[in-house]
Amino acid sequence: MSLLTEVETPTRNEWECRCSGSSDPLVVAANIIGILHLILWILDRLFFKCIYRRLKYGLKRGPSTKGVPESMREEYRQEQQSAVDVDDGHFVNIELE
């Protein structure tokens, strides 16, 4: 007798999951952690440029602007913004000849 004759083929009504341990707290916790991880990974991939620019430039405080005229403050803001705009960050283009 070959192995092929002993293999059971599932019928359509037997394809449902009948797990007896699906209400186990460890399984529930693992499912929740997995779903949260997937959501965070998707958000990271969608908004990575925005998030990492904010972390790189947004958390750094510049020098104090007390007593500095408004025109110089605006010039400083424009310089900082142009520095952020120039940095596209994570990708390198390599051209082959």
Swiss-Prot record:
<keyword id="KW-0597">Phosphoprotein</keyword>
<keyword id="KW-0375">Hydrogen ion transport</keyword>
<dbReference type="InterPro" id="IPR002089">
    <property type="entry name" value="Flu_M2"/>
</dbReference>
<dbReference type="GO" id="GO:0044694">
    <property type="term" value="P:symbiont genome entry into host cell via pore formation in plasma membrane"/>
</dbReference>
<dbReference type="GO" id="GO:0140321">
    <property type="term" value="P:symbiont-mediated suppression of host autophagy"/>
</dbReference>
<keyword id="KW-0564">Palmitate</keyword>
<feature type="region of interest" description="Disordered">
    <location>
        <begin position="60"/>
        <end position="83"/>
    </location>
</feature>
<keyword id="KW-1032">Host cell membrane</keyword>
<dbReference type="GO" id="GO:0020002">
    <property type="term" value="C:host cell plasma membrane"/>
</dbReference>
<keyword id="KW-1015">Disulfide bond</keyword>
<keyword id="KW-1083">Inhibition of host autophagy by virus</keyword>
<keyword id="KW-0406">Ion transport</keyword>
<feature type="modified residue" description="Phosphoserine; by host">
    <location>
        <position position="64"/>
    </location>
</feature>
<keyword id="KW-0407">Ion channel</keyword>
<comment type="similarity">
    <text>Belongs to the influenza viruses matrix protein M2 family.</text>
</comment>
<keyword id="KW-0449">Lipoprotein</keyword>
<keyword id="KW-0812">Transmembrane</keyword>
<dbReference type="GO" id="GO:0005216">
    <property type="term" value="F:monoatomic ion channel activity"/>
</dbReference>
<dbReference type="Pfam" id="PF00599">
    <property type="entry name" value="Flu_M2"/>
</dbReference>
<feature type="site" description="Essential for channel activity, possibly by being protonated during channel activation, and by forming the channel gate and the selective filter">
    <location>
        <position position="37"/>
    </location>
</feature>
<keyword id="KW-0946">Virion</keyword>
<keyword id="KW-1133">Transmembrane helix</keyword>
<dbReference type="GO" id="GO:0055036">
    <property type="term" value="C:virion membrane"/>
</dbReference>
<feature type="modified residue" description="Phosphoserine; by host">
    <location>
        <position position="82"/>
    </location>
</feature>
<feature type="site" description="Seems to be involved in pH gating">
    <location>
        <position position="41"/>
    </location>
</feature>
<keyword id="KW-0945">Host-virus interaction</keyword>
<feature type="topological domain" description="Intravirion">
    <location>
        <begin position="44"/>
        <end position="97"/>
    </location>
</feature>
<protein>
    <recommendedName>
        <fullName>Matrix protein 2</fullName>
    </recommendedName>
</protein>
<keyword id="KW-0472">Membrane</keyword>
<dbReference type="GO" id="GO:0051259">
    <property type="term" value="P:protein complex oligomerization"/>
</dbReference>
<feature type="lipid moiety-binding region" description="S-palmitoyl cysteine; by host">
    <location>
        <position position="50"/>
    </location>
</feature>
<keyword id="KW-0735">Signal-anchor</keyword>
<comment type="subunit">
    <text>Homotetramer; composed of two disulfide-linked dimers held together by non-covalent interactions. May interact with matrix protein 1.</text>
</comment>
<keyword id="KW-0813">Transport</keyword>
<dbReference type="GO" id="GO:0015078">
    <property type="term" value="F:proton transmembrane transporter activity"/>
</dbReference>
<dbReference type="GO" id="GO:0016020">
    <property type="term" value="C:membrane"/>
</dbReference>
<keyword id="KW-1043">Host membrane</keyword>
<comment type="function">
    <text>Forms a proton-selective ion channel that is necessary for the efficient release of the viral genome during virus entry. After attaching to the cell surface, the virion enters the cell by endocytosis. Acidification of the endosome triggers M2 ion channel activity.</text>
</comment>
<keyword id="KW-1182">Viral ion channel</keyword>
<feature type="transmembrane region" description="Helical; Signal-anchor for type III membrane protein">
    <location>
        <begin position="23"/>
        <end position="43"/>
    </location>
</feature>
<feature type="topological domain" description="Virion surface">
    <location>
        <begin position="1"/>
        <end position="22"/>
    </location>
</feature>
